[in-house]
Amino acid sequence: MEAVKTFNSELYSLNDYKPPISKAKMTQITKAAIKAIKFYKHVVQSVEKFIQKCKPEYKVPGLYVIDSIVRQSRHQFGQEKDVFAPRFSNNIISTFQNLYRCPGDDKSKIVRVLNLWQKNNVFKSEIIQPLLDMAAGIPPPVVTPVLASTTTAMSNTPGTPVTPVTPANVVQGLPDPWVSQITNTDTLAAVAQILQSPQGQQLQQLIQTLQIQQQKPQPSILQALDAGLVVQLQALTAQLTAAAAAANTLTPLEQGVSFNKKLMDRFDFGEDSEHSEEPKKEIPASQLSHVSESVNNSIFHQIAEQLQQQNLEHLRQQLLEQQQPQKATPQDSQEGTFGSEHSASPSQGSSQQHFLEPEVNLDDSIDIQQQDMDIDEGQDGVEEEVFEQEAKKVAVRSRSRTHSRSRSRSPRKRRSRSRSGSRKRKHRKRSRSRSRERKRKSSRSYSSERRAREREKERQKKGLPPIRSKTLSVCSTTLWVGQVDKKATQQDLTNLFEEFGQIESINMIPPRGCAYVCMVHRQDAFRALQKLSSGSYKIGSKVIKIAWALNKGVKTEYKQFWDVDLGVTYIPWEKVKVDDLEGFAEGGMIDQETVNTEWETVKSSEPVKETVQTTQSPTPVEKETVVTTQAEVFPPPVAMLQIPVAPAVPTVSLVPPAFPVSMPVPPPGFSPIPPPPFLRASFNPSQPPPGFMPPPVPPPVVPPPTIPPVVPTSLVQPSLSMTPETVKDVGFGSLVIPGGSVASNLATSALPAGNVFNAPTKQAEPEEKVPHLIDHQISSGENTRSVIPNDISSNAAILGGQPPNVTSNSGILGVQRPNVSSNSEILGVRPSNVSSSSGIIAAQPPNILNNSGILGIQPPSVSNSSGLLGVLPPNIPNNSGLVGVQPPNVPNTPGLLGTQPPAGPQNLPPLSIPNQRMPTMPMLDIRPGLIPQAPGPRFPLIQPGIPPQRGIPPPSVLDSALHPPPRGPFPPGDIFSQPERPFLAPGRQSVDNVTNPEKRIPLGNDNIQQEGDRDYRFPPIETRESISRPPPVDVRDVVGRPIDPREGPGRPPLDGRDHFGRPPVDIRENLVRPGIDHLGRRDHFGFNPEKPWGHRGDFDEREHRVLPVYGGPKGLHEERGRFRSGNYRFDPRSGPWNRGFGQEVHRDFDDRRRPWERQRDRDDRDFDFCREMNGNRLGRDRIQNTWVPPPHARVFDYFEGATSQRKGDNVPQVNGENTERHAQPPPIPVQNDPELYEKLTSSNEINKEKSDTVADIESEPVVESTETEGT
């Protein structure tokens, strides 16, 4: 008894918890009950008492205790040895009477438990049925024996009160033919049950009235049946139907349908002989209800039949017509849902149908959450012809999961079915042939029913839900897992679900303690749900819950159709948008049997339209569809081309001039008038981006001014972020561009995808753009910059006829004037100094506007884009990606060095978009072959004629005069050039020619660099490896000129390298993509690690040395640099001394960095090693004398001016960026006085750093060389 006491204490401790009760608590109670199984009677009694005495809100938890105990016992000991279920069933009626005293909201939970019991055969259907009736407010049926004394003569007239309902009365009140069918007490009890409701009493009264009128001698019943009776019949049937629909709970008629498949199966195959074998003493309520169903069918069928026999056909027709408006959906939905239940009596009168429907609805209301009820209710009033035709099909089509039971063929049901059959034959009077017909019909329907049942079983095995007529089933394969331990990992879930099948994804939400597991196959998800919901499976310390989850593909507008129990969204065909079909399958699958065949034809016609677009965008972004539409918004027909853009890139629609997208070349007469600012310039799809044009090929004969209507995605340079592989498919056959038209193409190609469509500078612009950009977003599969920011008239449009001098770099930052700020829209005509921030600067005549993404044509005087620091002679546009300045006529294309003659403003990728671009800088891809191939590997084919010179433009192309400042050689790394760097602009001036004062960069170094650089100006670009190698973040940034704030995160850093051989500013580092910047960018610039940067020794050595130094502490910073999204202000290290020698300089060859490098080394290196070195005084001296001074002197000479100028900037930046800096006060002084190398060795420094510093210095060179060599 100790176990019983323990159980009682657990059970009554429920009162200490506020409902709902946790699963853990239920588990404890269940365990206590199982331990006390020897005293199971006590346990059962305790639970029943608890339910009886507890507060209303604890009634349902009490039921859950019963459920948990019974199911656990069955699970543990097997159904046969389970003692709890039979014991609970002894007193279950009174227990449920107590349970139904719960709050009204909880009744649905009780019904749900009953349905689950029924579904899982926890209790017999005859036990559960009365409990369900109770929920509907129907008192449990009382079976009273029929006694002779209870019979009384029925002499009631319509006006007199109705006699009390007793089986005997019922029998007497029925016409003789009916009485012959109602013989035993079972049937009588069932009829009594039916007639106990008010509707039943009305029905009885109507029957009596009909009987009385039949007895009166009247010429015809037509006269006898006054309209009032018909109206009453109609009202009654309508009332019953409405009642069924209104009640969530079951109405008496609904009980007519048995819930239990077992029970129905009992009737399914059984002949009368089978029924006689069953014990007559037990008259389960469900059996009674089943009988009552047949009686219902009989009664109403007989009424209708009588009316027909009396030639009242037109009356019934009238009845049907009045009821037809009530039909919610066509008959076939009824058939689909109900299966063969309707085939049982296809042509019965409308009144009988009304009764039958609620019963069928019962099935669906329970299993399909009553969603079908509304649809199915009024469907009864369908003409007889429909019934006759459909009766044959119904059995085959019935698919509802629950209809194995509804297909039952009890003798009575067969009788009613056969009657309907005989009535079809001209309603001849009932005859003996009915029995033969019944057999024939039952055998026929049986085979079809069996097929339907087998098909249904197959679907159930696959975990597919019942099919609803004219409804699309979107079956979820996503499972919600609840009560997941917060410490659980994704691997725990994977381990649990792997056994069921392939997992597509797992999305954990630890704060809510849940997860969404998406399986690849519905069947796997179904099995996982079945198994994991039945037992207590734990993840970590918690027992998980599991249920169906709405799959991702179903949008909110369809959530109302979601059925959580079945894990399916039933979407009516009329509400399905064909465009959404593919999306539905995300996280789920579409039941192909429910797909409307018409959709297939619609979809098959659509691809034809889209083929044109897809050919134009060979590298569409995954899951992006390319759609071409004629924009009706604009008065002229404008083809809106949507180019898939890399997912991170905002899409904008290009509005080309009024040509269809498919048109490869604009009509000859088309003039290159720039579109209004809010429209994008158009590009010629037939022409490749400027960077790709083979230089040697003479331009085809095409009017240069022509503006291509649209830029085909394939032509557009793939966005930088793309990998070369994505570009492989692009066909370059069409890439050759007529010289005249090159400009237009060039402008587009240069735009980086990330930035494309964002007018970096202009903020007002977005508003104008919105309609176009949003409505027709151009997504370029390649992320290509092909689209130009709205404001920019595409070069094609702007450049139209332009002086040949305009060059464009695809993917390379064009030259921009640092000082000039460009408006995202169009700057309008500007003097040569105009630079565009958008990220593309083309040399433009002063008149040219520059658009947000592209700088209009600028006079050659424009020296470089923000990204390029080098000063160019005024005439030469500098392409960040191009090496060297070219005569104005020579266009630089990133891929071609000066390949193209005149046309083509440089296109800089719109760097201004600060955030988009960085993360995947195409630059990396481009770098390897940088200058020659703007896109680099991406369009290798495009420049057949051009040698892949690393950074050197063909001599013929480049003018030596032009070269002096050309930092151009630095390759496309510059693509991210920053259009205008406010910081840089002023600084640079000294460097630039007088003509472009704005452009100049403050660095005095520029001039110096020229001297030193010449030798190294076009060093071969390092292998891609070096390029991609992440640079030490600090160094680069430090070296570069101050970084523009603009350069900040989003915009790809421009390589300031133009400035001197040294990389000017590593904006890039600031930007997201640092790795490329450092090494890669250097390579781009043509500074090989192998080549000496300045007078000093190999790049390689320094670079590597620096890298290692950074290696330890740097790791984090490098990472940060790579994905920097922080204060870019500090990152750049544009400090004066940094400025003097780009960060690279620091990293690679600047001794000045030594001080903090030393500190860093101290931190990073083994202290033992450091200490040894520190101890060696000679080593320090040696270092000072031999090693440090020469490099410093050179460095100073080289970058003197810059160093002095930039001191201030660098300090904060360095601190922000580099860990080295933080910990090292000594380095700061060094920065402040970079020129004084001696300071490092000065007594102060020595004191600060102590011997360690000196030792570090010594060690550093060693480390450098070692690492460099290794590298």
Swiss-Prot record:
Superkingdom of the organism of origin: Eukaryota
InterPro entries reported in the protein's UniProt record: CID_dom, ENTH_VHS, Nucleotide-bd_a/b_plait_sf, RBD_domain_sf, RRM_dom, SCAF8_RRM, SR-CTD_assoc_factor
Disulfide bonds: none
Claim: tRNA processing is one of the keywords in the record: no
Pfam families: CID (PF04818), RRM_1 (PF00076)
Source lineage: Eukaryota, Metazoa, Chordata, Craniata, Vertebrata
GO molecular function: mRNA binding; RNA binding; RNA polymerase core enzyme binding; RNA polymerase II C-terminal domain phosphoserine binding; RNA polymerase II complex binding
SUPFAM superfamilies in the cross-refs: ENTH/VHS domain, RNA-binding domain, RBD
Composition bias, Pro residues: 902-912, 945-956, 963-972
Composition-biased stretches (Basic residues): 394-443
Region (Disordered): 270-289, 322-354, 384-468, 899-918, 945-1064, 1198-1271
Compartments where found: Nucleus; Nucleus matrix
Cross-link (Glycyl lysine isopeptide (Lys-Gly) (interchain with G-Cter in SUMO1)): 18
Biased composition regions of type Basic and acidic residues, renumbered to the chain: 270-283, 447-461, 1011-1027, 1034-1064
Keyword Transcription: yes
Domain RRM intervals: 477-551
Protein name: SR-related and CTD-associated factor 8
Alphabetical keyword list: Isopeptide bond, Methylation, Nucleus, Phosphoprotein, RNA-binding, Transcription, Transcription regulation, Ubl conjugation
Any one of the GO BP annotations: positive regulation of DNA-templated transcription, elongation
Residue ranges with Acidic residues bias: 1255-1271
Signal peptide annotation: none
Entry GO CC: cytoplasm; mRNA cleavage factor complex; nuclear matrix; nucleoplasm; nucleus
Species of origin: Homo sapiens (Human)
Positions of post-translational Phosphothreonine modification: 6, 615
